[in-house]
């Protein structure tokens, strides 16, 4: 396999694996290890009621929880993923042999 292909693809795969892992851990994605929906539950839940902690205030929280995916999440992904891809492509061009 060409090193440049691995250099460009690896950040995308890395981001995908950790996104799926943490959203599964936080019970946002309710999928089996093979990526199939579990029986009897919705495969995706956008609202999550986070556990009480010192960081989360006890008053003024919505009863259904906070949305997991927001405009800010979309903006970070819309800017971050292409940036990583672009930097990987530039780095891959450094190893081009003529």
Curated annotation (Swiss-Prot):
- Described function: Unknown. Resembles PsbF, one of the subunits of the photosystem II reaction center. However, it encodes asparagine rather than histidine at the site PsbF uses to bind heme.
For this UniProt record, give its keywords in alphabetical order, as a comma-separated list. Answer: Membrane, Transmembrane, Transmembrane helix
Q: Which family does the entry's similarity section mention?
A: Belongs to the PsbE/PsbF family.
Q: Where in the cell is it found?
A: Membrane
Task: Return one Gene Ontology term, BP aspect.
Answer: photosynthesis
Tell me how this protein sits in the membrane. Multi-pass membrane protein
InterPro entries from the xrefs?
PSII_cyt_b559_N
Transmembrane ranges, per UniProt, are 5-25, 73-93
Q: Which residues form a coiled coil?
A: none
What this protein is called in its record is: PsbF-like protein
Q: Which GO terms describe its cellular component?
A: membrane
């Amino acid at each position: 396999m060409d090193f440049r292909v691995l250099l460009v693809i690896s950040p995308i795969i890395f981001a995908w694996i950790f996104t799926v892992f943490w959203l599964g851990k936080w019970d946002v994605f309710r999928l089996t290890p093979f990526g199939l929906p579990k029986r009897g539950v919705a495969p995706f839940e956008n609202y999550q009621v986070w556990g009480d902690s010192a960081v989360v205030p006890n008053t003024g929280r919505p009863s259904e929880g906070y949305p997991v995916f927001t405009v800010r999440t979309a903006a970070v992904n819309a800017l971050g993923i292409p940036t990583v891809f672009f930097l990987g492509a530039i780095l891959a061009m450094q190893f081009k042999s003529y």
